């Protein structure tokens, strides 16, 4: 019986942890072509703030260097006022 109750408690803890995790994993934007073996994090940080990161994505680009992709925290959603 102790094993069954501990399994139930662990399951509940696991579900609560997932319920408390923030769902927003961030936003992405492409900033144009980037040179091979160069980081584009500086461009991303200048555009989206200090917490942004950038990388060259070679899988979607038609240019030889790749496409600069930025990952940054999404701005908060502002609710619209109702016009009723």
UniProtKB/Swiss-Prot annotation:
The signal peptide, as residue positions, is 1-23
Choose any GO biological process term that the UniProt entry carries and state it: defense response to fungus
Q: Where in the cell is it found?
A: Secreted
Q: Which InterPro entries does the annotation name?
A: DEFL, LCR
Disulfide-bonded cysteines: 27-74, 34-56, 40-68, 44-70
A Pfam family the protein falls into: AtDEF-like
- Origin, by domain of life? Eukaryota
Instruction: State the GO CC annotations.
Output: extracellular region
Q: What keyword terms does UniProt attach to this protein?
A: Antimicrobial, Disulfide bond, Fungicide, Plant defense, Secreted, Signal
* PANTHER family in the record: DEFENSIN-LIKE PROTEIN 172 (PTHR36788:SF5), DEFENSIN-LIKE PROTEIN 183 (PTHR36788)
In the record, the note on similarity to other proteins reads: Belongs to the DEFL family.
Q: What is this protein called?
A: Defensin-like protein 172
> Highest lineage ranks of the organism?
Eukaryota, Viridiplantae, Streptophyta, Embryophyta, Tracheophyta
């Amino acid at each position: 019986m102790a094993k069954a109750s501990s399994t139930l408690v662990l399951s509940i803890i696991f579900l609560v942890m997932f319920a408390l995790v923030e769902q927003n994993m961030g936003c992405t934007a492409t900033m144009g072509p980037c040179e091979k073996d160069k980081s584009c994090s500086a461009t991303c940080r200048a555009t989206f703030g200090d917490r942004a990161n950038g990388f060259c994505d070679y899988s979607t680009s038609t240019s030889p260097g790749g496409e600069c992709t930025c990952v940054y925290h999404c701005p908060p959603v502002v609710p619209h006022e109702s016009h009723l």
